[in-house]
């Protein structure tokens, strides 16, 4: 476009030079004209007109109405405007030529007179030829003749040169060749005429030799003129060249667009391929979990059987106890004295165990109650059995009580610490009370003392049995213990212990009736001794846990402070987001990114659904396990405090998550700012590069996902570091032997850091890791067997500890079963947090919604606190259920029933939460898209304030209705149009530079806009090369730094290895601690593996992203370094890794393989260290080596790719060394902090340089993606192998199970717990990529589970009765709360969207009003121009009157004669050219041309010849007007056809609206059973139908009015026949005309106020405006007739002129009606699509909502695009209207002059008749145009009807699907909001249709008035013809007095002019046809575009239907694929 502008400037300068040359020539002619004959005069007179005609045609011909690309229109418009200016200049030159011709006529007359006198003198006085006076006359005549001949020769030379130039440029101007040939023919004729004149002058040359010299000089002058003509030809050639350049520029733009489109298509295909791969992975993963679930079910069935067996044993034991009761009664006196001593001993023992018994106070109190109950049960066995049943009922009632307690504890969430303290005080009080009651019972009486002694003995023995958990073999061997059990049989265990796995089945239960007192006391003392051992051991653990509690509480306080700081940051970010809603284009890109995120969420949701299914099954198993865990109530109570501490840790973790969320907010906001900078460069190619914009949006979305993944990885790393700290503290407090495991954990933490850095490179490692999982499981099996052997050796020494460990393991089984879900749920939590970050950016100005998001985040934090060990609690955190879960755990709900019910509740509510969150994200994305026009990127606006200072004035006008980028683009388009008027070439250059800058910014989205613009303008290639060189240097520097870090890391590895060796050496002596810690380590490995799997998926998504994520990673590194200095090294390595990953996927695979080798090496080291204790691990190591060999095969396959990309081998080696180095960097992080910080700062400064290398990476993206697909396939194969290995491990597990059954019952329970543990490890060890992150979560969850178990036992009795009520009320409250939240969010989001839409419509309305004001001003200018035209017409007629001999002087300045609507006589070539259809169509923005001047050649003596010439020109003008009338009639018929098409299209729109109403009604029928609030939609549709019927009635009324107006037109024709008697009333009518003009302005204002809805059909407006210009004077008369209906349309020429303006407005309204119908269709389609997608969302999933928003955004974008295009065309129409008004003003002045001249009434009548004929022709043309428009409307309506039918069918299908879903109630409120929006839309459509009908009626009325005006004009034209005939008769009389030669010349001249006029009319007709064809093609193109859009929408809707069908399932079960 810049080139086109420059070319326009050059053309302007060249034409200006030519015109100046012509002016100078004319001036010279005026100074030196001599006497010439009439023949010469006639010949030269037409020459200026011919020159002007040639130039005009050459300028206008290239601008024929050929369909130009949309991108060329601006250039052509500016070029045409320049041509208009040049034509005006030519008009001025022609005026000068006309004046010179008049002077030449005078000189010719003088020459004739002098010649006659000379001839007379020669005849009368032949002897006096040498006298002075004749000689003077001869010289004078010779001089005059010489000057004339010189001028003729000059013109001839110019014409000849022009002909030659045209021939030389024939190939470049093929389109002008025909006209050039005509011009050559004309020149030849002129030359022939000159030769003839030369022959005539030969006689004079015989009389005077000087005559021949004069002729020769004249020939020379003619040649000079021909040379000038050649220069004009050169100018034309230059113009054509510039047009060619503009065309080539447009072609280049088209090529760029195609390239971008191809890129976008390729990216879409790649994305689809990745989605397919992800789905395959999900299917395999779901299959794996299904298998594991089956195994868990089998295992827990065995557990249930075992529980039943234990229950039976308990019943037998109770019978024995009843028998022992009688024996104890007989020996009570003997035992009394021993009881006193025993009481003393017991109090002493209890004082020593006080620390442990403090946490068992509540259970002790319950045991006291049970002791008293058992005294009563001794009397009656039936009563005891009944009590046992009551206990069971109470146990089942606890669940309900716990549910009630949950609701109460929700209110006490903030006071949880105080509650814990109060509970501790209560426990102490209960303990003291128990002691007092015990003392009272002992001293009360002997019988009471004996009973108390028996109860205490039984309590002690039972407690000892519950803690010790003796094996069956031991109990068989120890007879005394059996006796004691028999003795204690009278006391039944507490209900919580009946089915506890901690209580084994007694192999013998024989009573001991003869048991002596001494034996009883001995047994009691032995039991107490064992109990004391247990108490001491628990005391040690308690002290350690207290230390850890202090540390964790401190950390919790720190995390709380950090959380508050993060909340403040969140508030600040929220304030910043208020101005971040201005990027409409960014919102579109966000739509794409959200779509990809939605797909990812869908996949994650599927995985989570499967995990939830497994969790549900595990919950059911935990319910069965509940009674087994009751024996561990005392230990769980002691662990309660620890659980609270872990919960505080969870709070801290939540705070950390929020900090990460805030960092992600800042990073994403930075990315948004930078993307807004990119959007500013899309101005010139906005329409063509929409697909490229979508592609870049996808890349940016991937970049955000990479940033998210890095944030998640860093969060995991921080959690792992915290876990390491906790583990170290625990190890220090427990035993020195745990230092080895601390070192091991430390090493694992280092490995985790490495894995986090290489998370994107480990995708191919999954199969190998799964093999390692199998080996690790085998190792675990061997270790377990060794542990069992060790336990057998030290069984008697550590009976108490084994019992406690058994209880813990039983509790950990549930925890481990739940730990599997933790990584997945954390991943889901991270994604939800990312959504929260998006909400923080999007919910500007909506504090309420943002507060809800904060509450959501708070609920997530609380869920993390309360759910720690249980992984489903994380999901409840997202669902807002974590608060209730944690509170219920603190209150002591049982692990079984409570877990099952809450999991079921979680399952239903979690799915709802996920759906609501996704819907919230989608709705917020929609809201952001609608509001981003003025609010989205305030931060970006601040950063670009300096740069956009020059553009703000242009942006302010549209800032409220579009985003900052969108406004900049629109303003740049306007500015480009303005610049196109001055410099087309400069605009082209700027356009190319913008394209290049856009491409580069698309590749480097993070760079600053200032540097990017400076670089991309001139030095892109050079700087790219320099940056590549610097990248290599940077790589070398990084390699050196990596080498340095590697050395330190190696040292750290050596230290870690030494620590591991020490730990292994200590492990032999500390087997029990090792066993406990080994279990923790296994759990950590399992959790870490799950986390590694999540990170691997994140890495896979990052690998597929564009490498522009380096900026986001850099920002993430900066934030993480500020929080933790240790994270700096990890982030730096992550940045380098991502950079290397962007360069080569093969490098990543190699690095992945190397890292896998390192992990294998570490695993070998660990296995070698364990060889000293576990010889059975050799087999596991052998299998590991086999898996490694398989991995080697994969590495060899990867080596093929690595060899092809061998260039990065050195860099991969450096990365490996850096990974090894960073393993030791954890210990040395403090010392390395400063150096790493400096290094990171240097890297950040150089990242800009490194980013340039991504240009080359884009070329390799295709190959890398192919390699990634191969890797994915290999990973799937490895997964299948892993499943096979898992099946083998299951077989090994069954063998281990058989071995475990051979052990004692206590060891059997341990084996059972270990089998459950193995199930968990097999799930987790195969996913070791999340190694250390899961370790921290494992530790936290373990502690929380212990505390939860303890609390469950403590609160069991208290909440037994309230649990049922609380559960019921809690479920209802949660459902109600969730529904209310969902409803509120949906309503708020939709309200915001409606407000944004209303604001946008308001802005458009204001813009339309501004445009209406502009049109009003243009109308005023047209009025002035009309008056000027009227004055010119008056001047012309005055000249004619003077020419008829009335004695009037010629006008001082010739005025244009509007003999035709826009054409003049042939001599007025410029007028012809200017008014050509080409110019009108292609130069809407140009200034109106100067009308052709009407020469006034009348001499002072009123030469009849001059009068005759003027009359001849007038006659020619009349004929031209007649021809134009015919053309206008044709155009009127075309308009009529268009009108018919528009009406048909309107009918189609009506029918489609009815179909839409039917579709909505069907949707209402489907949803009426769920929610009756949607019935309003049907009411709205009824209103719409009513409005349609009303519109139909109005249309019929309009047709009637049209018929009436036609009849009125006929009456007007009869009235115009009598207009001669009414011409005297013209003065009075003039005043009415002014009033009509004012009313016309009002009508124009009313029409312009609706132009904002009429923009889609402005393409056809140009053709209409062209025809309006051709018949401007006629339309002005029609406008007058429109306003002067009261006077029965008795108007003359002025009436026709006014009606012409009215006709123009009618045409605009007609086009507006069509555009309004189109936009109504588009808006209706968009709203229907929105309703459809809303229905799909409420029934299927919230993904449909996001797609709906995307579709709506696309529609809005397309609408905005069309609006801008039509805005340009409207500007052109405004220019045309301004020109028309100016011409109308000129014509008005002419009419006034005619009214003042009563003597010319006869001539005026004749002219009016000619104009009437023209008007009739225009009317015909209008009718044809209306018919074509109606046809077009009909077609569009048919298409819209089809679209509506399709949408209706889709809606019905969605409604049926929706009826099958259970969650439709939650979506009903959202649908209500959509219904309101649809109501508004339907109202809007109704209003638009009403306006359309009004416009149609108005158009019909105006058409009728135009017909009547045409009739009157025809009458006036007939009268003018009669007057012309009279004038011709006079001319014939005058011609008789002239020579025959002059008559012949005049005839030839007239014939030539007639031929030219015929040619001109033919070209105009052809051009009109081309215009119609162009409009038809444009219409078809629009139809095809709509069809494509419909097909695209259908495809997307089907895809969303398939996608949405997956997440929905019945709420009672987990969702399935």
Curated annotation (Swiss-Prot):
Which GO BP terms, alphabetically? cellular homeostasis; centriole-centriole cohesion; centrosome cycle; ciliary basal body organization; epithelial structure maintenance; establishment of localization in cell; establishment of organelle localization; photoreceptor cell maintenance
The primary site where this protein sits is cytoplasm
Q: Where is this region: Disordered?
A: 464-518, 1184-1226, 1443-1575, 1962-2017
Please give the coiled-coil regions recorded for this protein.
Answer: 70-262, 318-444, 546-1058, 1091-1438, 1505-1704
Q: How is it modified after translation?
A: Phosphorylated by NEK2 which may regulate its association with centrosomes.
**Residue ranges, compositional bias (Pro residues):** 2008-2017
**GO molecular function terms attached to this record:** actin binding; kinesin binding; structural constituent of cytoskeleton; structural molecule activity
**Does Zinc count among this protein's keywords?**
no
Q: How does it assemble?
A: Homomer. Interacts with KLC3, NEK2 and the N-terminus of CEP250. Interacts with CEP44. Interacts with CCDC102B (via N-terminus).
Q: What is this protein called?
A: Rootletin
Please tell me the species this chain comes from.
Homo sapiens
């Amino acid at each position: 476009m810049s080139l086109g502008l420059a070319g326009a400037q050059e053309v302007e300068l060249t034409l200006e030079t030519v015109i100046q040359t012509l002016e100078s020539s004319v001036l010279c002619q005026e100074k030196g004209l001599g006497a010439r004959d009439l023949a010469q005069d006639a010949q030269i007179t037409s020459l200026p007109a011919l020159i002007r005609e040639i130039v005009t045609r050459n300028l206008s011909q290239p601008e024929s109405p050929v369909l130009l690309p949309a991108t060329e229109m601006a250039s052509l418009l500016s070029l045409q405007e320049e041509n208009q200016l040049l034509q005006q200049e030519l008009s001025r030159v022609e005026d000068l030529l006309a004046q010179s011709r008049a002077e030449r006529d005078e000189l010719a007359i003088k020459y004739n007179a002098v010649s006659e006198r000379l001839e007379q003198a020669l005849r009368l006085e032949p002897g006096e030829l040498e006298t002075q006076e004749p000689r003077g006359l001869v010289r004078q005549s010779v001089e005059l003749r010489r000057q004339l001949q010189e001028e003729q020769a000059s013109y001839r030379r110019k014409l000849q040169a022009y002909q030659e130039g045209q021939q030389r440029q024939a190939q470049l101007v093929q389109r002008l060749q025909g006209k050039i040939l005509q011009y050559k023919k004309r020149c030849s004729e002129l030359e022939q005429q000159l030769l003839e004149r030369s022959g005539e002058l030969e006689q004079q040359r015989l009389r005077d030799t000087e005559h021949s010299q004069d002729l020769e000089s004249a020939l020379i002058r003619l040649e000079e003129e021909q040379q000038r003509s050649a220069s004009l030809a050169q100018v034309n050639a230059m113009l054509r060249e510039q047009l060619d350049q503009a065309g080539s520029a447009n072609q280049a733009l088209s090529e760029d667009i195609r390239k971008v489109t191809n890129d976008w298509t390729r990216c879409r295909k790649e994305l689809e391929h990745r989605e397919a791969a992800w789905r395959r992975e999900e299917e395999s993963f779901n299959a794996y979990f299904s298998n594991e679930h089956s195994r868990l079910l089998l295992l827990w069935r065995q557990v249930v059987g075992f529980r039943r067996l234990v229950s039976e044993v308990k019943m037998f034991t109770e019978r024995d106890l009843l028998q022992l009761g009688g024996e104890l009664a007989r020996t009570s006196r003997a035992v009394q004295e021993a009881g006193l001593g025993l009481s003393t001993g017991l109090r002493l023992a209890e004082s020593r165990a006080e620390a442990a018994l403090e946490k068992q106070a509540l259970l002790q109190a319950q045991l006291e109650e049970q002791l008293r109950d058992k005294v009563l049960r001794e009397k009656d066995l039936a009563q005891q059995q009944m009590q046992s049943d009551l206990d069971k009922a109470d146990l089942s009632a606890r669940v309900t009580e716990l549910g009630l307690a949950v609701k109460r504890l929700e209110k006490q969430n903030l006071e949880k610490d105080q509650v814990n303290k109060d509970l501790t005080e209560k426990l102490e009080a209960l303990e003291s009370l128990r002691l007092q009651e015990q003392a009272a019972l002992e001293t009360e009486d002997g019988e009471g003392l004996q009973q108390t002694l028996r109860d205490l003995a039984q309590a002690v023995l039972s407690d000892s049995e519950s803690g010790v958990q003796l094996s069956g073999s031991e109990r068989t061997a120890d007879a005394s213990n059996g006796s004691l059990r028999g003795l204690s049989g009278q006391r039944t265990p507490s209900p919580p212990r009946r089915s506890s796995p901690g209580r084994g089945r007694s192999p013998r239960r024989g009573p001991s009736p003869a048991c002596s007192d001494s034996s009883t006391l001995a047994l009691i003392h032995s039991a107490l001794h064992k109990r004391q051992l247990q108490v001491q051991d628990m005391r040690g653990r308690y002290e350690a846990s207290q230390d850890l509690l202090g540390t964790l509480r401190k950390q919790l306080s720190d995390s709380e402070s950090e959380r508050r700081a993060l909340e403040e940051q969140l508030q600040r970010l929220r304030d910043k987001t208020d101005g971040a809603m201005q990027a409409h284009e960014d919102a579109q890109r966000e739509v794409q990114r959200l779509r990809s995120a939605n797909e990812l969420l869908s996949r994650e949701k599927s995985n989570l659904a499967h995990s939830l299914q497994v969790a549900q099954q595990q919950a059911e198993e935990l319910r069965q396990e509940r009674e087994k865990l009751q024996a561990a109530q005392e230990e769980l109570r002691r662990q309660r405090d620890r659980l609270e501490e872990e919960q505080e840790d969870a709070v801290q973790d939540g705070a950390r998550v929020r900090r990460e969320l805030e960092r992600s907010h800042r990073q994403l906001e930075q990315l948004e700012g930078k993307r807004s900078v990119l959007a500013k460069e899309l101005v010139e190619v906005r329409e063509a590069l929409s697909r490229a914009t979508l592609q870049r949006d996808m890349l940016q979305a991937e970049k955000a996902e990479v940033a998210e993944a890095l944030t998640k990885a860093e969060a995991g790393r921080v959690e792992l570091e915290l876990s390491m700290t906790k583990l170290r503290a625990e190890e220090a407090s427990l035993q020195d032997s745990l230092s080895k495991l601390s070192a091991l954990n430390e090493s694992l933490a280092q490995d985790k850091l490495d894995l986090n850095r290489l998370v994107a490179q480990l995708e191919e490692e999954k199969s190998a890791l799964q093999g390692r999982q199998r080996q690790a499981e085998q190792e675990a099996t061997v270790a377990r067997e060794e542990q069992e052997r060790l336990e057998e050796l030290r069984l008697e020494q550590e009976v108490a500890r084994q019992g406690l460990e058994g209880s813990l393991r039983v509790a950990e089984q549930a925890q481990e079963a739940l730990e599997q879900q933790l990584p997945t749920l954390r991943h889901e939590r991270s994604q939800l947090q990312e959504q929260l970050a998006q909400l923080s950016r999007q919910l500007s100005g909506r504090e309420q919604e943002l507060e809800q998001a904060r509450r959501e985040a708070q609920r997530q934090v609380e869920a993390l606190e309360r759910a720690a060990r249980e992984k489903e609690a994380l999901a409840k955190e997202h669902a807002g259920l974590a608060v209730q879960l944690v509170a219920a755990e603190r209150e002591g709900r049982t692990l079984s029933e409570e877990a099952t019910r809450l999991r079921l509740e979680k399952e239903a509510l979690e799915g709802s939460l996920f759906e609501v969150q996704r819907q919230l994200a989608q709705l917020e994305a929609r809201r952001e898209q609608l509001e981003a026009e003025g609010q989205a990127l305030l931060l970006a606006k601040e950063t670009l304030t300096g740069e956009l200072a020059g553009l703000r004035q242009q942006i302010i006008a549209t800032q409220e209705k579009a985003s900052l980028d969108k406004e900049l683009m629109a303003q740049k388009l306007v500015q480009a149009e303005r610049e196109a008027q001055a410099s087309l070439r400069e605009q082209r250059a700027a356009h190319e530079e913008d394209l290049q800058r856009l491409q580069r910014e698309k590749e480097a989205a993070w760079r600053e806009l200032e540097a990017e613009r400076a670089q991309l303008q001139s030095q892109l290639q050079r700087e790219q090369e320099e940056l590549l060189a610097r990248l290599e240097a940077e790589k070398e520097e990084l390699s050196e730094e990596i080498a340095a870090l590697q050395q330190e890391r190696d040292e750290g590895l050596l230290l870690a290895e030494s620590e591991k060796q020490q730990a292994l050496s200590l492990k032999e002596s500390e087997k029990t601690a090792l066993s406990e810690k080994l279990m923790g380590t296994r759990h950590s490995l399992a959790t870490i593996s799950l986390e590694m799997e999540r990170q691997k998926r994140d890495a896979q998504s990052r690998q597929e992203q564009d490498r522009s994520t380096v900026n986001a990673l850099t920002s993430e590194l900066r934030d993480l370094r500020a929080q933790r200095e240790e994270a700096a090294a990890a982030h730096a390595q992550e940045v380098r890794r991502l950079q290397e990953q962007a360069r080569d996927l093969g490098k990543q695979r190699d690095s992945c393989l190397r890292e896998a080798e390192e992990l294998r090496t570490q695993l070998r080291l660990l296995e070698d260290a364990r060889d000293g204790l576990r010889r059975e691990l050799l087999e596991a190591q052998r299998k590991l080596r086999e898996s490694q060999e398989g991995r080697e095969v994969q590495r060899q396959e990867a080596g093929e790719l690595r060899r092809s990309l061998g260039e990065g081998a050195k860099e991969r080696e450096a990365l490996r060394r850096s990974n090894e180095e960073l393993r030791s960097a954890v210990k040395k992080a403090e010392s390395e902090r400063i150096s790493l910080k400096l290094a990171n700062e240097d890297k950040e400064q150089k990242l800009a340089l490194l980013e340039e290398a991504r240009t080359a990476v884009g070329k390799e993206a295709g190959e890398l993606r192919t390699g990634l697909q191969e890797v994915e396939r290999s990973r799937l194969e490895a997964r299948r192998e892993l499943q096979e290995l898992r099946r083998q491990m299951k077989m090994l597990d069954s063998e281990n199970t058989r071995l475990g059954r051979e052990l004692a019952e206590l060891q059997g329970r341990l084996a059972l717990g270990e089998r459950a543990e193995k199930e968990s490890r097999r799930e987790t060890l195969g996913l070791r990529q999340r190694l250390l992150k899961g370790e921290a979560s494992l530790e936290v969850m373990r502690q929380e589970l212990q505390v939860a178990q303890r609390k469950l036992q403590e609160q069991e009795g208290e909440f037994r009765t309230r649990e049922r009520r609380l559960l019921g009320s809690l479920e209802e409250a949660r459902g109600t709360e969730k529904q209310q939240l969902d409803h509120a969010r949906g309503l708020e989001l939709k309200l915001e969207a409606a407000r944004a839409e209303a604001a946008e419509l308001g802005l458009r309305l204001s813009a339309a009003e501004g445009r209406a004001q502009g049109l009003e001003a243009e109308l005023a200018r047209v009025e002035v121009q009309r008056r000027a035209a009227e004055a010119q017409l008056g001047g012309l007629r005055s000249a004619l009157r003077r020419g008829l001999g009335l004695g009037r002087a010629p006008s001082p300045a010739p005025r244009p004669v509007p003999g035709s609507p826009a054409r003049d006589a042939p001599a007025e070539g410029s007028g012809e050219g200017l008014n050509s259809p080409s110019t009108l169509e292609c130069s809407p923005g140009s200034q109106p041309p100067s009308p052709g001047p009407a020469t006034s050649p009348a001499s002072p003596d009123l030469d009849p010849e001059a009068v005759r010439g003027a009359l001849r020109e007038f006659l020619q003008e009349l004929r031209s007007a007649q021809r134009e009338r015919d053309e206008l009639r044709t155009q009127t018929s075309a308009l009529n056809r268009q009108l018919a098409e528009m009406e048909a299209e309107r009918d189609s729109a009506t029918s489609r609206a009815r179909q839409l109403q039917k579709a909505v009604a069907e949707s209402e029928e489907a949803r009426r059973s769920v929610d009756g609030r949607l019935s309003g939609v049907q009411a709205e549709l009824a209103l719409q139908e009513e409005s349609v019927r009303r519109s139909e009635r109005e249309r019929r009324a309009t047709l009637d009015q049209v018929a009436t107006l036609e009849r009125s037109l006929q009456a007007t024709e009869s009235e115009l026949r009598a207009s001669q008697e009414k011409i005297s009333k013209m003065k009075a009518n003039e005043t009415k005309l002014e009033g009509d003009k004012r009313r016309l302005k009002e009508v124009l204002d009313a029409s312009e106020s609706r132009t904002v809805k009429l923009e889609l059909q402005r393409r056809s407006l140009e053709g209409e405006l062209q025809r309006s210009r051709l018949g401007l004077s006629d339309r002005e008369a029609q406008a007058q007739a429109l306003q002067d209906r009261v006077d029965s349309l008795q108007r003359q020429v002025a009436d026709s002129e006014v009606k012409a303006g009215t006709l123009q407005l009618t045409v605009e309204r007609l086009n507006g009606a069509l555009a309004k119908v189109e936009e109504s269709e588009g808006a209706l389609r968009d709203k229907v699509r929105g309703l459809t997608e809303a229905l799909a969302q409420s029934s299927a999933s919230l993904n449909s909502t996001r797609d709906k928003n995307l579709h709506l955004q696309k529609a809005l974008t397309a609408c905005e695009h069309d609006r801008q295009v039509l805005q340009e065309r409207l500007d052109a129409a405004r220019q045309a209207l301004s020109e028309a008004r100016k011409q109308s003003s000129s014509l008005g002045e002419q009419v006034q002059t005619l009214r003042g001249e009563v003597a010319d009434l006869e001539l005026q009548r004749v002219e009016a008749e000619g104009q009437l004929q023209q008007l009739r022709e225009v009317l015909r043309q209008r009718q044809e145009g209306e018919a074509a428009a109606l046809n077009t409307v009909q077609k569009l309506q048919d298409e819209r009807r089809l679209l509506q039918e399709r949408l209706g069918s889709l809606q019905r299908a969605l409604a049926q699907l929706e009826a099958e879903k259970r969650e439709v109630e939650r979506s009903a409120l959202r649908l209500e909001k959509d219904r309101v929006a649809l109501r508004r839309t339907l109202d809007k459509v109704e209003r638009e249709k009403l306006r359309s009908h009004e416009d149609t009626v108005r158009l019909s009325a105006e058409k009728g008035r135009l017909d009547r005006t045409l009739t009157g004009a025809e009458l006036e034209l007939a009268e003018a013809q009669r007057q012309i005939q009279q004038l011709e008769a006079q001319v014939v009389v005058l011609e008789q007095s002239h020579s025959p030669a002059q008559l012949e010349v005049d005839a030839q001249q007239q014939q030539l002019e007639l031929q030219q006029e015929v040619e001109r009319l033919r070209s105009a007709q052809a051009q009109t046809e081309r215009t119609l064809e162009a409009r038809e093609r444009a219409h078809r193109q629009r139809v095809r575009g709509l069809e494509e859009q419909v097909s695209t929408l259908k495809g997307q809707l089907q895809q969303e239907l398939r996608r949405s069908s997956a997440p929905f399932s019945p709420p009672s079960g987990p969702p399935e694929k």
